[in-house]
Amino acid sequence: MRTEQINGHPLSDVVGGGDPELVAQEVVTAIEKYGELCPADSILDVGCGCGRIAAALTQYVDRESHYVGIDIVPGLIDFARNFITPRYPSFKFLLLNESNKTYDWWLRQDGEKGIATLAEGVSPKSIDLAISVSLFTHLDYAPALEMLTSIHHLLKNDGRVFMTVFVLDAAAINAIEDRRAVFSFKQRTPTGKLNAEKSDDPTFAVAYDGGVLDDLIGSAGFQLERHVRGYWSSGGPGETFQDALILRKAKNPDLGEHRAKRSEKYFSAGDYRRPERHAVQ
C-alpha cells in the first residue's frame, strides 16, 4: 500500500513531518531487522498516528495477520480507519481518551477508551510484537510506565517491543556538548525524572538518562535486548532518527534481577549518568 493520501493531509505534521512513506519504510526496515518481524505476527502499534507504519506493514505481514493501532488524536484514527481498514480488514484502529500537552490542540476528550481499559479492545497475551514509534519521546515517567506496563499485559509470553526514545548516554551527551545533536535536552520534566527540550512544553521531546530508562524497563517487566543508536545524536546517517530499543517480556519480571542483568552487553560501563548528576551546559 502506498501513502500518497497522507502527503499534504492537514494532520500530516502531527505525526512528525517528513515524507510519510520514506519515514515509515525506514522504521519498518529497522523493525524487520531488529524486532524479528514475522509475517504471521499479531501487532500492536501504540501511537499509530494516521497509519503510515501500518500502511508499510501491509507489505510485510500476512493479509490475515492481526494488527491494532491506537492513538489519542481523533482525526488521525478516523483517517486510518477510512484509508487502511477497508483495504485490509484485519487492521483495526482504536481511539484512546488520554491527554498530552503537545497534542492537546488536536484532542477531544470524549474518546472511546483510556489506557486502563485498553484490554477491552485487545485481548491479554494476544500480541507478538508491540511497536511504539515517537510516543515515549512525549511522555513523562508516570504515563510512560503506565503505558509500558499495559503493553506488557497484552503481550504473549516472550513477546517483544520495538520502541523509540531519546537516550542520554555518554555518546549522546558528548554530541550535545559538541553541538552535533539535534536537541540539547537542558530542561527537566515536571517529575524531575526526565530531561526535556522545552521548559514551556515538557512533552514536546523528552530524553531518558540510562538509569531512569533501566528502571522504567525493569519496572514494566521487560528486559533490554538491544539499543540501536539514532542519528539525532550521531552526527551522521543512521537507521532511525530516534534511538530504537528492543525489549523482551521478562520470564521473571523482577526489577532486582533485571538490574543485575542490565547491560554491559549493550552499553559500556559509565555510559549512563543518573539524573542528579546529569547537566548539559
Predicted regions and their residues:
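Short glycine-centered segments of the SAM/dcSAM-binding site in methyltransferase folds
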Residues: 42, 159-160
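A short glycine-rich, Lys/Arg-flanked "PGG" loop and its adjoining helix->strand segment in the class I
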Residues: 145-157
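Conserved class I S-adenosyl-L-methionine
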Residues: 40-49
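Short catalytic micro-motifs in class I SAM-dependent methyltransferases
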Residues: 134-135
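Local beta-strand N-terminus motif with an aromatic residue
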Residues: 40, 127-128
